Amino acid sequence: MDLVNGLVALSLTHKELGVDELSKVANGVHRVCVSLRQPLFVLHTCNRVEAYLYNPPDEVVEIVKSGYAPYVEKVVERRGVDAARHLFRVAAGLESMLIGETDVLGQLEEAFDRQVRAGYTRELLKTVVERAIRVGKRVRTETGISRGPRGLGSLSILYVKEKIDLTNARVCVIGAGSVGRGLVKELIDAGARRLVVVNRSVEKAADLGVEVWPLSERSVERCLEDFDVVFTAVATFEPIIKSVPRDARVRIIVDMGMPRNTAAGLPVEVVTIDSLRDLADRFNAMRDAEIKKAEEIVEEELVALERLLRIRWVEEVSAKLLEYWFKIAEEEGERAGGLEAKIAARTTVKRTLLPVVNYLKKVAVSDIDEAYRIISVLRLSYGLKDL
């Protein structure tokens, strides 16, 4: 058996739906996933809403799919190495509208950290996502795929510069997550000097070196009233810009939020990811030579992934065995003389069983079925049902 075969990916991306439709899907996917006990990882950006699971029962897959309503029939399901390949390609920027963009890697890391802390992304699925992040970093280090505009934020700034002189414009960025922070830095590089950031936490945006306002309905209204360009990059399921005040100064709103940060029908130009497709295509054509190099790295890492999963699997199983043996050792140590004897007993268990664990890792790398057989014998011998 190959452990990567347990991976399942459910995806809707910019290739299947427009940004507005993707925006509607994200809330439903999160809603059905939060109640699941299955290890899972959800990634939603401007360009994608994806759920990754490991060894899920068929009914769990169907539950997650239901969250994609009303676009369930468009969901792309991948399994095993195809699912891992897709995640690696996403991390590498190969599946982005702007090939090689860096925003997606930051969003992937943020989502991973958040979901690991919450206990959703765990066990072997955690290993897969960790490896994807490594692949994304390696591709950008070893290839030139990210030269030029580094993300959709960069593209949006280029788009705005064709219409407005940023050196004289008043610019507001709402949101200081990975996308918002990137926008601020690139706007400064592009010549924007009259720049304000609006964020839920003023402290978290203080290091950006610009004026920061706390996020509120009034601060958003002030941005629209007093600024020429407003960028939004806030993680929220409700629009933060629902209307534009009469006689507002704003000329362009750039909505980088996922889901959408702006309501439909605003009386000013709203730039979304869909607005940037033609510009992205131009730069993608310039990156063709680097795509093959990036794809070769992805394939190398897929081979390494199975080996890593086998080692991690042995470590997880061994941890449960060690816990069982430690418990016995501590009980015997307690009988023999208290704390010092307990510590000595634990140390003896570690020293005695470490060679067994290392041997199991070697066996698993070369023959996972044999490793599983050995562990099954241990499980039956000690009456451990949850190995």
From Swiss-Prot:
Name the chemical reaction catalysed here: (S)-4-amino-5-oxopentanoate + tRNA(Glu) + NADP(+) = L-glutamyl-tRNA(Glu) + NADPH + H(+)
Where is the site Important for activity? Answer: H86
Q: Name one GO molecular function term.
A: glutamyl-tRNA reductase activity
Q: Any idea which positions bind NADP(+)?
A: G175, A176, G177, S178, V179, G180
Record keywords, A-Z: NADP, Oxidoreductase, Porphyrin biosynthesis
Please list the residues that make up the active site. C46 (nucleophile)
Q: What class of enzyme is it?
A: oxidoreductase
- Pathways per UniProt: Porphyrin-containing compound metabolism; protoporphyrin-IX biosynthesis; 5-aminolevulinate from L-glutamyl-tRNA(Glu): step 1/2
The residues that the entry says bind substrate are T45, C46, N47, R48, S96, E101, T102, D103, Q107
What EC number(s) are associated with this protein in UniProt?
Answer: 1.2.1.70
Q: Which GO terms describe its biological process?
A: protoporphyrinogen IX biosynthetic process from glutamate
- Record text about domains: Possesses an unusual extended V-shaped dimeric structure with each monomer consisting of three distinct domains arranged along a curved 'spinal' alpha-helix. The N-terminal catalytic domain specifically recognizes the glutamate moiety of the substrate. The second domain is the NADPH-binding domain, and the third C-terminal domain is responsible for dimerization.
Q: Which PANTHER family match?
A: GLUTAMYL-TRNA REDUCTASE
Q: What does this protein do?
A: Catalyzes the NADPH-dependent reduction of glutamyl-tRNA(Glu) to glutamate 1-semialdehyde (GSA).
- Family membership noted in the UniProt record: Belongs to the glutamyl-tRNA reductase family.
Q: Please, what other remarks does the record include?
A: During catalysis, the active site Cys acts as a nucleophile attacking the alpha-carbonyl group of tRNA-bound glutamate with the formation of a thioester intermediate between enzyme and glutamate, and the concomitant release of tRNA(Glu). The thioester intermediate is finally reduced by direct hydride transfer from NADPH, to form the product GSA.
> Could you describe the subunit structure of this protein?
Homodimer.
- The identity of this protein, by name, is Glutamyl-tRNA reductase 1
- Quote the gene name from the UniProt entry: hemA1
